[in-house]
């Protein structure tokens, strides 16, 4: 875990911030989702899957790319 000089888990803080933004944005950017996927630790995956599942469930026509992201996380 990368920590700054004060013991802060920078990776964890960035992941948490990105997860909040992805959850609150109606259509989160692919760049933001790519970055969070690069930074995810195994413990972070269930929260991210939950966020994506909520988006797919509430969208009348879920995007193909969002569905592909979910499927990629299951393999």
Walk through the language-model features, giving the residues of each.
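Solenoid-like repeat scaffolds
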Residues: 55-60
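Long, compositionally biased
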Residues: 66-75
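Amphipathic alpha-helical scaffolding segments comprising HEAT/armadillo-like alpha-solenoid repeats
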Residues: 14-16, 45-53
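Absolute protein N-terminus
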Residues: 1-2, 75
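N-terminal acidic leader/helix
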Residues: 2-39, 61, 68
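Solenoid-repeat scaffolds in large eukaryotic assemblies
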Residues: 36, 45-48, 64
């Amino acid at each position: 875990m990368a920590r700054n000089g004060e013991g802060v888990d920078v990776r964890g803080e960035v992941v948490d911030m990105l997860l909040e933004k992805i959850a609150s944005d109606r259509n989160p950017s692919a760049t933001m989702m790519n970055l969070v996927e690069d930074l995810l630790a195994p413990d972070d995956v269930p929260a991210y899957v939950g966020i994506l599942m909520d988006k797919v469930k509430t969208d009348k026509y879920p995007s193909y790319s969002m569905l592909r992201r979910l499927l990629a996380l299951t393999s």
